[in-house]
Every structure is written in structure tokens, then in C-alpha cells.
Amino acid sequence: MDKRKGSTHARSRGRVEGQSGHPGSSRRKGRPMTTGRGRNGRSGTRRAKKVNRARKRRNKILFVMIIILLIMILAAGAVFFKRYGSSNEEADKEQYYGIENSDDLALIINNEVVKKEESSAKSSSDSSTDSVIPGKVFDGQYYVAYQVLRDKINSRFYWDANERVLLYTLPDGNVSVSENSSEYTAVNETKSEDYVILKTDGDIAYIALPFIQEYTNMEYSVEQEPNRAIITSKWGEIETAEVKKDTQVRYLGGVKSPILTEVKKSDKVTVLEDEDDWMKVTTADGYVGYIKTKFLKNQKKEKISRDFTEPVYSNMTEDHSINMAWHNVTNVAANNAVQQVLASTSGLTTIAPTWFSLADTEGNISSIADADYVNYAHTAGMEVWAVFRDFHGGTNSYDETYETLRYTSKRAKLEDQVVAAAVAAGVDGINLDFELISSKCGVHYVQLVRELSVKCHQNNLVFSVDNYVPQSYNSHYDLKEQGIVADYVVIMAYDEHTEGSYEAGSVASISYLQDGIEKTLKKVSADKVIAGIPFFTRLWFETAKSPEQLSEEAGTEAASYPNKVSSKALGMEEAAQSVVNAGATAQWDEKTQQNYAKWSADGGTYRIWLEDAQSLEAKLKVIQENKLAGVAEWSLGREESSVWKLISQYVN
């Protein structure tokens, strides 16, 4: 009984153990739980081990995949950061400023870092070299190269590399400094500083900053590591901003660009350019770079200024409009024609005889001045402004004029001689007509203008200067400076087409005059400008070039012109008569505002743009509309007598 009970109990326990442990579970409905006993138990164990091994393999694969994924994420992050993250690379500051040696001084002038190549030989001075260091430090003092001083700070300083002297022209004379000296002459007074004013390195002059400031409306400060001077010489409105938080100024606009310097919260910067996400700025200590726009605030306009008294150059302008006529006098005997040439004139205020010229390249002048001529003109109620030329005398080339003017002693010699001759003849003024000025001679010519102006005014002589119509190629005549130191600036609004032109054309079209006046008035006040007009024109003769001629000219400017031209200058009456003699008829040309005629003869074509009362009136209207100081005519004896009444209607 007990055995059966025990057996029954065992079976019963076996069923209980074989069940899943929840309602509805049976062998038929699910896999039974194995206990490890019997054949079926051993088979279940193997299956469990197999499952465990599979699970481990899956876990390993999953782990490896996670590791690979993490590596990929890290790699992608590194690539992303490399491409888009901020760089901590610092710029080489000495390279940024162009510093090569321990005594070099970097210059930041009006928010611009001046590089070595920017201060090299591209200027008009013959003392320039190809490798000018912008600034230097000598014996603890800071110096600026002359080329940089002239081009970027104060163009009135003048360096004579031949005679080793630095000049600065004041209204009453020159300030003069010799090299390696702490002494200088201000007009006639000797002064000194506690530093050497002028140092030289070959032909390169370096001028001490405090001495420059004495004659210049500028402020400067100096920073170290590296040595640099921050100079401001332009005043007026600027844009500033405040730094929101500590950040970097970078070389270019972008987070990968090298860092120039750090700026602190509340630092003030000058804003130069707005490039959306970045601002180009200048820091107070002289770095010009870029800051993220979001790090700036309180952006605003400010006016900056400095108390400084600019030198005032005295002027001897007349209290009436100028009606001046040049008188082309070629020898002493020609002075006797003054009565004849003035006989038919009316309304003239000034006569300008061509009396003085350069005799040689040593600073001597030739003169055919005549006191009797002056007395007659004065009796007729006119002033005499004697013309001083660099041609039709002993010299007649660009090189000869350059060779004369680039020496201070030669300039002083010719200035003294021409003023003395003018005073001796009793003239009222000097009219400077130097037309052979090359670009390299420009700075020397302008210095002549300054110096001669001072000496004229010291001798009660009106000083006027003749100029071509302003063009880019003659900008070295420096109309702006002329307008400051001279009494009158004369624009010769003729020779639009000359004897050497490759094609026929007007000597003085209306647009040529208008353009000349417009460009001049950008640099010189109207009450100092005199417009020169012609009493002559050119009769042109043109023939078609042969194939042989075109072949010979191949590769030259002349080759682009199909006709060969020649011309001769004619006075107003002679020009009009040439049209009549040819049986031609002149017609009004609206474009040039001149009467134009052409005719065929002598195997070619003649063309002429006439100067007559009609064309002159068109020019006089332009002069009047622009409220200029007056008019000048080239030249006496070539006009129609009727023009004087016309001119008087427009020039009172």
C-alpha cells in the first residue's frame, strides 16, 4: 500500500514537475522544462548550452558593432571638428607685421598694416628702392621711412637723396634737417631735439616720429612684442563697437584662421568692414583682423579729431576775374611788338610774356625780360605775369628738367634768379609753365612749386601754375598741393589733339574743357582756377596708309590707325580763310561745339575744327557756369579782334 502510494506520489510529482507552472500549460502546448534526468534531460542540456553559445556569439557581435559604431562616431566628430571647429593656432606676429630684424618697426597707419612691398619703389620718387622697411628703431627712438611718410602720412615732407637733406616747406620758408643730426633749421632759426631727427640707410631716409608729429596732424602710440607704431592721421567719422565677451581676433574671417590676438570684454574696436558673420576690425594695440559679429555690441558712428593748427599759406588772389593772355615772346626784339598785339584788345587784366626759361641743368635761368614792356602794360591798365618755362631755352627735355630739379641747391639757385629778374623788371607775378615733368620728377617739381610760391609771396609777386588737363598719367603734377600753395592754378584746356597725334581731331572740344574743369575742381577751389582756351586750331591732312606702311608699324600703337596724318597750327583768321580758299563749307558739330569742315585735295582729305566766336562762347559759358577765377588765352596775335568783346561779356 505504501509502495503504491509512494509510486502514485512519484508519478504525481513527476507530472507536477513536468508542467509549466501556469494554467493551460502541458507537454502538447509547450516545451517542457527539463530537469537533467533521463535521456530527455541530457538532450535538453545540450540544447541549452547551444543556445547559450549562440547568445554569447550574438553578444560579441553586438559588442563589436557598438565599438565600431562608437569609433565611427568619434571619427566623424573628429572630421567635423577639424572642418568646422575653432582653431587654436596662433599667427606668427612677426610674419604678420613683416618684421625681419630686431630693429624693424611695424607700422599700422589709419587702420592699415603697412607691408614692406607697399613702401617700395612704386612711387614717383627717385630715392625709392625695392626693399624699404617701413619703420625702424634706432637707439630707442621710433622712425618712419620717408616713402611711407610721404605716401601715407604727410606728403609735404621732401627728401633730397643727393644732398642728404630733409625739407618741410612752411608758409615763410623751409625747415631743413641734415642726416644723423639732432639740430635743424626752421626758416632762419636753428633748433634742436634730444634725439637724432633723421637717420639713413643708403638712400633711404628714416624720420623720427615725434618730429613728424610736430608738423603733422597725427597721433601715435607704440607697442612692443613685436615693436609697432599705431598712427592716426585721418580724422572724421569712424565706426566703433564694444566686445561682448572675451574672444579672439583672427587673421581672416573664419574659425580655422590663425589667432592674431585676444580681446577682453568691454574692449573697444574700430569696425572696418561688415562681412555678416564676421567683422573686420582694428584693435587698440594695432591688430587688424576679424571678430565674430555675435561677439560685438553697441556698434555706432563716432567722430574723432585732434587739436592741430595747419599751416596757412598766404595767397595773393586778385579782387577781380582774370582775363589773361599769353604773349609768345621768343627774343628780346619781340618785346617791341607789345603795343601792336595789345592795340586791338579790350578787357584784358593780365598779359603773360614768355620771358624766363632754364638755361642749363645747373640752376641758371635765361631771361629776356623788359622793364619798358612792363611799364607799357601798366600804363594800359594790365598786370604782367612773366612766364617761366622748362623748354624753348637752354634745356628742352624731361631728363634735363629732372636733373635740375632733383637737387635742392639747383632749385634754390633758379628760384632766386627768376624772382630777382622778375623784381628787377617790375613784373607783378610769375607764371610757372614747366611741361617736361616725368613721373619720377614729380616730387621734385612739387617742391619747386612750394618753394617758388614762398619766395614769390615774400617779394609781393602773384604766383600761378600752368597745367595739362588732369589725367591719370600726369597726376604727379599734384593739383591738390598746387591749389594750397599757389595763387592760381591754370588748366590749359587745349592740345586735345597735337602735332604728334595718330588721328585728326579737335584741339579743344567742349567735352575736353568740361572734363578738365570737373577733374580740377575736385582738388582746387573754383576761385583759384583759370581755364586756358585756344586762339588757334589745326588743319589736318590725312592719307590712307599703304600695306607696306601698315606692315612696318605692326605691333605699335600707330598700326591701329588706318590713316597717316599731319597737321599745322593756324590762328583763328587763317583757319577760317583756309576753308574759304578750299571752297568748303563748315557746319556746326554738336558734339565738339565747333564748326567743322573737310575737303578732298592733294590726294588726301583735309579736316579742320574751327575756333571762332561760336565755339569760344560755348567754352566761356562753361567757365562762367563753374564760377572760375577767370580765363587765359593762348596766344596773343592769333585771335579775331571780335573775340575780346565776347570774352568781356563772360569775364568781368
Residue ranges and their predicted role:
Residues 351, 432, 489, 531, ...:
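Conserved, mostly hydrophobic/aromatic
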Residues 55-275, 304-317:
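Primary recognition of N-terminal secretory signal peptides and signal-anchoring hydrophobic helices
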Residues 306, 393-395, 400, 537-619, ...:
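Glycan-binding loop/region signatures in secreted carbohydrate-active enzymes
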Residues 355, 413-444, 491-503, 632:
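Active-site groove signature of glycoside hydrolases
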Residues 329-345, 408-423, 471-479, 611-624:
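Short, acidic/polar
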Residues 1-53:
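N-terminal targeting leaders characterized by basic, low-complexity, disordered sequences
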Residues 361-368, 416, 442-577:
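Substrate-binding surface in catalytic domains of secreted glycosidases
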Residues 303-417:
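Glycan-recognition patch characteristic of GH18 chitinases/ENGases
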